[in-house]
UniProtKB/Swiss-Prot annotation:
High-level lineage: Viruses, Riboviria, Orthornavirae, Negarnaviricota, Polyploviricotina
Pfam families hit by this protein: Flu_PB2_1st, Flu_PB2_2nd, Flu_PB2_3rd, Flu_PB2_4th, Flu_PB2_5th, Flu_PB2_6th, Flu_PB2_7th
Protein species of origin: Influenza A virus (strain A/Chicken/Weybridge H7N7)
MF term (GO), any: RNA binding
Entry protein name: Polymerase basic protein 2
GO biological process: one example: cap snatching
């Protein structure tokens, strides 16, 4: 009672009432909030209030010698009174203006180099074009995006070492600079930053921006490359969007884009080879993107895309634990299941063996143009909430979810036989068979699914079998939402295994990825992709195969010619001749091969008919399995430029043209290299008869000691090798034959062998 009376008395005074009603700070919690702790609670207000004062800045005492007390207008620049609690001087904002105009100048040459990322951003914005603002509902979903355009892809540890080496070279501590990119960057930066006067800490901070990828989990509708993310606040709000075209590209976006294209091409090509995993690794290791080894990029680049992840898995790197189906990334958010094989009958009474997931599970599905939440039980879809950019995208997501649910009505909706094959002509697994079938035509699936009346829920509408929205009815369990489903935010990576058919599994044996999941979308890479592997010659079409095959023969002629004379079968089996076969009509392959092999055998048997150019020209044709026939050809046809073109067995043609004067070969008008030897050597007087019983292997090989005279050869044991002096003082390596039966042919081949070994 006493308290209330006291309060009443206080309230009766007009001053009390005024304080409590007119002033906003009338709550102890608020007073506490603004007065406790060192952290400034309202920086903007504090700044305005400070700047309204005469001397809001404090500076070191030395400033009094460097700045006059008054400026040209007679305004005071600093006060003689000390700053309370320190021995600093109180300074006016006008002093800053004076300093900027009249203070000492320093070299600005390093600024664009240190603040490179900022200067480049200004250029991009200057040249970018902003389009009209449109008001519409924005379906944003959170994605992990790169917020830092123009960076290299170093790990933070690698970057730390580079920064210490460049900015603080005299600091103690071991620094390990191993990767090629680390060394290149360190060298460039040390040169750039010689005599740099900018504070080292600032340099280090800016330098970090150039080296390390920074990602954030942000709501995005539209482009996700870093040059779009840097203007996110300008291009999309809650209910509006502004069209924008960046005024420049940055290397990190180009690397991401080119990496995806290279990985897709490699996975597609590997899938059709005899040993997909070995081929994939061979291609990843021999490919460069923008001059950097693809394997180095894969180790550092966090891009998550099906093909990229398959390549990473093959290299033994960790990848995200989400799995891919029908081009959507699935992440299980709750529930669990066990897998069991089950046989089911399609509407066409075809038997399929599917791995059924038994149990209740919830998933998020994220695709490029649609996202969804899926709740399912054993072979039953309970609920699917979809959102997408347009009708088509929403339909794609619904089909994938319906197939994934493994419901009986979906399997019964199959009309006709399922016999889809992959690029290697192998049948797809049953789940992908079903997916392909309904992706081609989902009419029966949607019609058979069933519809149900729906409740009116905010932000959700129904969708009918013809994919039109409806507020009363909807496909059973399916709703369309205005809100997108966020991408899985975690950056956790898991250990995976990969089999030789490129199927990637987690440690519990669940398939996360397979070549069927790799997109067929073709794009043009921003950076040059150099595939050194012969498996990728086809990627640029038949002409490239032709030129590359001949270039390869010429580059490796030294070893090729020895194999040609000693072990032709091994030579014909080389994978470098594989792509070439696709240029020759199936019907002619065997006949051409038989003809060329016979011709080659005659060259080996008959003295003086050895013709380097002709061997090079015909060699690729001999790689196909030969047919024994008596057919003779004067020209062989290859399919390039959309039609058959002839390669003449004797003589030049537009396809294969050898210029004797320059010793250069052109294939389809493109230079294919130079022959280092004279292809028409005269027959040297070789003591071939004396070399009976010996096999000529190669040029002199110093490891086998000094050259013996021909008489000394007789002391060699069978299978022993030695260098021997022949004819015009040339030295060749020979081996004494293990069998005597082949002695007859030795004298015939010796001439050609010697000639080859000498050259």
């Amino acid at each position: 009672m006493e308290r209330i009376k006291e309060l009443r008395d206080l309230m009766s005074q007009s001053r009390t009432r005024e304080i409590l009603t007119k002033t906003t700070v009338d709550h102890m919690a608020i007073i506490k909030k603004y007065t406790s702790g060192r952290q400034e609670k309202n920086p903007a207000l504090r700044m305005k209030w400070m700047m309204a004062m005469k001397y809001p800045i404090t500076a070191d005492k030395r400033i009094m010698e460097m700045i006059p007390e008054r400026n040209e207008q007679g305004q005071t620049l600093w006060s003689k009174t000390n700053d309370a609690g320190s021995d600093r001087v109180m300074v006016s904002p006008l002093a800053v203006t004076w300093w900027n105009r009249n203070g000492p100048t320093t070299s600005t040459v390093h600024y664009p180099k240190v603040y490179k990322t900022y200067f480049e951003k200004i250029e991009r914005l200057k040249h970018g074009t902003f389009g009209p603002v449109r008001f519409r509902n924005q379906v944003k979903i959170r994605r992990r995006v790169d917020i830092n355009p123009g960076h290299a892809d170093l790990s933070s540890k690698e970057a730390q070492d580079v920064i210490m080496e460049v900015v603080f070279p005299n600091e103690v501590g071991a620094r390990i600079l191993t990767s090629e990119s680390q060394l290149t960057i360190t060298k460039e930066k040390k040169e750039e930053l010689q005599d740099c006067k900018i504070a080292p800490l600032m340099v280090a901070y800016m330098f970090e921006r150039e080296l390390v990828r920074k990602t954030r989990f942000l709501p995005v509708a539209g482009g996700t490359s870093s040059v779009y993310i840097e203007v996110l606040h300008l291009t999309q709000g809650t209910c509006w969007e502004q069209m924008y075209t960046p005024g420049g590209e940055v290397r990190n976006d180009d690397v991401d884009q080119s990496l995806i294209i290279a990985a897709r091409n490699i996975v597609r090509r590997a899938a059709v080879s005899a040993d997909p995993l070995a081929s994939l690794l061979e291609m990843c290791h021999s490919t460069q993107i923008g001059g950097i080894r693809m394997v180095d990029i894969l180790r550092q680049n966090p891009t998550e895309e099906q093909a990229v992840d398959i390549c990473k898995a093959a290299m033994g790197l960790r990848i995200s634990s989400s799995f891919s189906f029908g081009g959507f990334t699935f992440k299980r958010t709750s529930g669990s299941s066990v897998k069991r094989e089950e046989e089911v009958l399609t509407g066409n009474l075809q038997t399929l063996k599917i791995r059924v997931h038994e149990g209740y599970e919830e998933f998020t599905m994220v695709g490029r143009r649609a996202t969804a939440i899926l709740r399912k039980a054993t072979r039953r879809l309970i609920q699917l909430i979809v959102s997408g950019r347009d009708e088509q995208s929403i339909a794609e997501a619904i089909i994938v979810a319906m197939v994934f649910s493994q419901e009986d009505c979906m399997i019964k909706a199959v009309r006709g036989d399922l016999n889809f094959v992959n690029r290697a002509n192998q049948r797809l697994n049953p789940m992908h068979q079903l997916l392909r079938h309904f992706q081609k035509d989902a009419k029966v699936l949607f019609q058979n699914w069933g519809i149900e009346p729906i409740d009116n829920v905010m932000g959700m509408v129904g969708i009918l079998p013809d994919m039109t929205p409806n507020t009363e009815m909807s496909l059973r369990g399916v709703r369309v939402s205005k809100m997108g489903v966020d991408e899985y935010s975690s950056t956790e990576r898991v250990v995976v295994s990969i089999d030789r058919f490129l199927r990637v599994r987690d440690q519990r044996g669940n398939v996360l990825l397979s070549p069927e999941e790799v997109s067929e979308t073709q794009g043009t890479e921003k950076l040059t992709i150099t595939y050194s592997s012969s498996m990728m010659w086809e990627i640029n079409g038949p002409e490239s195969v032709l030129v590359n095959t001949y270039q390869w023969i010429i580059r490796n002629w030294e070893t090729v010619k020895i194999q040609w004379s000693q072990d032709p079968t091994m030579l014909y089996n080389k994978m470098e001749f594989e792509p070439f076969q696709s240029l020759v009509l199936k019907a002619a392959r065997g006949q051409y091969s038989g003809f060329v092999r016979t011709l080659f055998q005659q060259m080996r048997d008959v003295l003086g008919t050895f013709d380097t150019v002709q061997i090079i020209k015909l060699l690729p044709f001999a790689a196909a399995p030969p047919e024994q026939s008596r057919m003779q050809f004067s020209s062989l046809t290859v399919n390039v430029r959309g039609s058959g073109m002839r390669i003449l067995v004797r003589g030049n043609s537009p396809v294969f043209n050898y210029n004797k004067a320059t010793k250069r070969l052109t294939v389809l008008g493109k230079d294919a290299g130079a022959l280092t030897e004279d292809p028409n050597e005269g027959t040297a007087g070789v003591e071939s008869a004396v070399l009976r019983g010996f096999l000529i292997l190669a040029k002199e090989d110093k490891r086998y000691g000094p050259a013996l005279s021909i008489n000394e050869l007789s002391n060699l044991a069978k299978g022993e090798k030695a260098n021997v002096l022949i004819g015009q003082g040339d030295v060749v390596l020979v081996m004494k034959r293990k069998r005597d039966s082949s002695i007859l042919t030795d004298s015939q081949t010796a001439t050609k062998r010697i000639r080859m070994a000498i050259n």
